[in-house]
Amino acid sequence: MINPTVEALLVLQERDTRVAALTAELQLLPRQIAAVDDEVAARTAKFDELKTRTRQIEADRKKIDLDVQSKNAAIARYKSQQQQTRKNEEFAALNHEIEHAEKEIAALEDSELELMEAYDKGLAAVAEAQKELLAFQEKAKHKKADLEKRAAGVSADLIAA
């Protein structure tokens, strides 16, 4: 038979150990919740950066398109001036400008095609990243709810102990 005093001390020691474990867990849970929030924020920022880069590609493509339109307008002006000129030197100079502008247009259109391909890939990447982000946010929401529920349970256990 165990002495009643020793038995009471063992029960007290068990409660103290339980209280210490619950207190440690209760202190850890807010950090775990914050870590979930931080991960959601980091993934959201990464997604936003991908969207921004994709939008920038489209903006660059539109700028090139405007440059092409500008060059085409310049070619039309040069051709109009060419019809009005009477000197061979002026005609040749305008012809050279037209050829130069046409080469620039070809280079710009090549760049525009590359940007269109990059934009299409960017849109696909954004769509995929959005699906992944939404799935992660849903998973994180459940994990956070579980952690908060666990924190409430630990608090209740701590009060009961």
PLM regions and their residue ranges:
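Short coil/loop "hinge" linkers that interrupt or connect long alpha-helical coiled-coils or helical hairpins
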Residues: 4-7, 11, 62-100
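Short, charge-rich amphipathic alpha-helices with coiled-coil/heptad character
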Residues: 1-55, 127-143
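Coiled-coil termination/hinge junctions
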Residues: 140-161
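Non-transmembrane amphipathic alpha-helical segments
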Residues: 19-22, 29, 43, 50, ...
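Alpha-helical coiled-coil
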Residues: 32-84
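Long amphipathic alpha-helical coiled-coil segments
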Residues: 73-74, 108-133
